[in-house]
C-alpha cells in the first residue's frame, strides 16, 4: 500500500505532490494510519499530509526501490495513529497551524477541537497566540478536504 511504502521512506528526502495544494518537500519523519509527517525544507517546522491528499511521491530511485521491498518490521505505534489522533494532539498543545484545503484555500490559526471527521479552527495570524482579541473567525473543516497541515514555528 502507499502507507506501507511511505513508512519505508522515513528519514528520506522526498517531494510530495498534493492533489489540490502546493507540493511539500522535505524529509519523511513518520507515517501513521492515514497520514505522513514531513520535516519541511521550506523552513516550517513540520507538515502533516493526509494520505488521501497525496497525488505522487518523488524520491531517489534507490529509495523508491527500497520502499517496494517490505522490511518485515512490525508496525510502530505511530503507524497505527490516525489523522484525527494527531490533530487532537495539536489541539491539546494549542499549536498554531497553516491548513491548506481542496479549492486552494489556506487558513492560519489554532485547532480548537478535532473530531472523528472534522476539526474546528480558530482563525488568527501566523505566529500569533490564540487569544480572543486575535481570533478573526472560526472554521469547521472536514478531513476529506485537508491537503496539508503545517505547524507554525512562531507560537508552538
Locate predicted features.
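Short glycine-rich, low-complexity segments
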Residues: 1-25, 29-108, 112-118, 122-156
Amino acid at each position: 500500500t502507499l502507507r506501507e511504502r511511505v513508512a519505508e521512506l522515513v528519514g528520506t528526502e522526498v517531494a510530495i505532490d498534493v492533489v489540490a495544494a502546493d507540493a511539500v518537500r522535505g524529509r519523511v519523519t513518520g507515517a501513521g494510519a492515514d497520514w505522513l509527517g514531513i520535516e519541511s525544507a521550506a523552513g516550517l517546522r513540520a507538515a502533516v499530509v493526509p494520505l488521501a491528499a497525496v497525488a505522487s511521491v518523488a524520491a531517489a530511485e534507490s529509495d523508491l526501490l527500497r520502499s517496494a521491498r517490505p522490511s518485515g518490521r512490525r508496525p510502530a505505534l505511530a503507524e497505527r495513529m490516525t489523522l484525527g489522533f494527531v490533530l487532537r494532539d495539536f489541539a491539546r498543545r494549542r499549536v498554531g497551524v497553516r491548513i491548506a484545503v481542496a479549492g486552494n484555500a489556506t487558513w492560519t490559526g489554532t485547532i480548537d477541537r478535532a473530531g472523528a471527521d472534522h476539526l474546528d479552527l480558530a482563525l488568527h495570524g501566523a505566529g500569533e497566540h490564540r487569544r480572543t482579541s486575535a481570533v478573526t473567525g472560526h472554521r469547521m473543516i472536514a478531513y476529506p478536504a485537508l491537503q496539508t497541515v503545517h505547524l507554525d514555528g512562531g507560537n508552538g
